[in-house]
Amino acid sequence: MAGIGFELRKMLRRNTLTGLMQAYTYAGLIGAGPWVLSIVGILLIGVLSVPFVKPNGAVTQFQVSVTYLIAVSLVLTGPLQLWYTRFTSDRLFEKRRELVLPNFHAVMLVVTAASALIGALLALFAFGGQTAGYRLLMLAGFVVMSNIWIATIFLSGMKRYVAIIVVFFVGYAATALAALALKGFGLTGLLAGFVAGQTVLLCGLLGLIYRDFDSDRFISFEIFEKRYRYPSLMLIGFLYNLGIWIDKFMFWYSAGTGQPVIGPLRASIIYDIPVFLAYLAIIPGMAVFLLRIETDFVEYYDAFYDAVREGASLQHIERMQRAMVEALREGVWEILKIQGMAALILFAAAPTLLHWLGIPALYLPLLYIDVIAASMQVVFMGIINVFFYLDKRRIVLWLVGAFVVLNVVLTALTLASNPAAYGYGFALALFVVMLASLYWLDRKLDTLEYETFMLQ
């Protein structure tokens, strides 16, 4: 916990407004940086390329192609993300650091093989009408993106947040520059620039990993042994990523809202733009989440379990437990307040923002509900992260499973309704699971001492 938590606590100890603002800015950039850089990078490439790329629809084809690469690679690697993070954390706790890198190579090999096989089949049979260059670049991009998520989740688990944001900035700067340099080659040039930039990003992430870890063995498949498997974490990783994207796929492939773009890929103009903009509003909530979880909560969490392991007095254990619970409740309440304020500010600025971007005011109602949904997603993410600290995997599995089911059912109902209802399926699904997660968290915190001592 030393890395980011130590830096944030150092800023907060100054007890100045500047220190507080610096800590929030630092946490916001780290917490939401990769998301924001990804969104801004793709949008920037599109905006700057429009006047130069022919045919006119090539930029849209590029943005849609990249969106699918991101979405499908996230869902594909979801089962491995949390599983490998848990494996690595356990080996570091056991002081078996030499096992980390060989098993990372094994995971990368499996991800590369799976993404290459799936990508090759899709390139051959689903994109038969496209050029060989486009199909090869989509295949390469799919493999690279899949490996990026594994490397990113690994470094996140090791609390290398600052390094991640720096590498993502360099990677997306390289992506934008390469894509713009090759824009004269149309869609193929833009996609080649994207793949080149993402390769730079992946190399940067791998460089961070190799700098911190070494081993006498190159590869080891211990992670795939039965004793190290975590089926619940595999399902959670898959279902969470599926839940985030399933409503988008439903809008893309619905006859009334989706339009064909290139090959089998479709997009929903009415749904996609507000969603992209709404996710830019999560920065304040992510800042508060990271600041409060990695400082106050983690500090008391460590103190509580250290007291339990070291046999401290009951009074001290109870005091640490109360402090941990209070820090957590204050943190959740602060996330709700700050994210709510950010949503209200965006509501007020939305008409001007859409006008400045040249987007019709018709998108305003959907943007509003998407901002609310994104805000609830931040709260939901924060709570399930706490459940992971408490090792309540079964609860998280139920929550993300319910999220997927509710998102599918409610989005289907809104699609069958009228355009005024669009976006409410995703928002209502998040609202229900957010309330459920708050309820379960409150219950588990009340019984934390009992479960700590009696259920071991």
Where are these regions (language model features)?
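Interfacial segments at transmembrane-helix termini and the short loops linking adjacent helices
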Residues: 125-138, 321-330, 341, 345-375
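Membrane-interface helix-capping segments at transmembrane helix termini in multi-pass transporters
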Residues: 53-64, 94-103, 117-143, 355-364
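N-terminal membrane topogenesis motif
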Residues: 1-42, 60-64, 225-233, 445, ...
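Membrane-interface junctions at transmembrane-helix termini in multi-pass inner-membrane proteins
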Residues: 146-166, 368, 372-398
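Small-residue-rich midsections of specific transmembrane alpha-helices
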Residues: 63-89, 241, 245, 275-300
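Hydrophobic alpha-helical transmembrane segments
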Residues: 167-211, 420-443
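Specific pore-lining/lateral-gate transmembrane helices of multi-pass inner-membrane transport
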Residues: 92-104, 272-353
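Transmembrane helical elements of multi-pass membrane transporters/channels
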Residues: 197-295
